[in-house]
Structure formats: C-alpha cells, structure tokens
Amino acid sequence: MPAPEHLGEFNDSLFPEPENLFDDYSGRCPAAAEQDMSLEKTFTEDWDLKLLTREEMLANPDNRLSKVYFRMPEEAQHKWDSVYAGRIAEYRSGRLKGQELVRWKYQQYMRDYLATVLSVDESIGRVLDYLEMTGELDNTIVVYTSDQGFFLGEHGWFDKRFMYEECQRMPLLVRY
C-alpha cells in the first residue's frame, strides 16, 4: 500500500510491459496455467486495484481495503479518494476488455507497487541519516533484505509463489 505522500506518484508513468505478459504457458506443467496469481483472472477489484469508493467502503467496513482506508487520517483519505477516483471511473466505463484490460491492470499494479517501494527506500534513507546525525554510521552495520521479489507482470503474474527466475531476485542492502 503506498504511503499517503506517494499516492499517485507514478500515475503519469507508462511502464514497459514484460515480453511474456500474455504467456500461454505452453510446454510447462499445468500449475503454470492453473495458478492463482494472474493479472487477468485473480487480481482483485478491491484489494489489488483499489476500486472501491469511500461510499462503498462505508457500506462494507469489514472489507480488507476498507479497514486500511479507515485507519488513515482524514487528509490521507481525501488524497486517496482524489487519486483513485480517475482509476475507478476508467475501470467502470466498461471500455476496457481483454488484453487492453490486462495491460491497464498491469499499469495500475506497477504504479502502486513502485509508490510503495519508494516509501521503503525513504525509510532506509531515514535510518542512514539518523545514524549519520548521531555519529554512529561508521560504527553500525546496516543490513536490509526481504523475501523473494514479486513477479512484475512476467508471465501475466503479480505474486511470488513460483520459483521462476524473475522472482528469485531479492532486495539486499549492506552498509558498513
């Protein structure tokens, strides 16, 4: 979930599509075609695409997205509403179909994902700045890592459940 200050940060960006965004999974085991992490089939309207209006979240406060939304300060909710209103309108226009819809979902995914990663980058920067300010940077080993990375549209996927090359790369930062 992007931090409020980064909501919409990449909304004007157009990201290159992976060559295999529309992979047909031919020549591989059935699991590749039957997986449950497809931008086309599995990407949810609420949690993944964030396509609920404030009114819809008020009507369904137990929805996972609603719970996150209503924990935000009011000013962040207003920013959220303005950033996602255009996305909701475009999706509900009914003009997005087939591969065009998958491409659109991919762009929304990348915009939100990179806005989220931007917050992680800034947080690491704050830790390093603090260590420098307190004179402890040269006395401290900083290690940041994570579990394996996400598929970023490769094979038409958005999660990280299979051991394919694309998601085996892991963030690793070491500062000493």
Protein language model regions, located:
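Active-site-proximal cap/lid insertion segments
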Residues: 1-139, 143-176
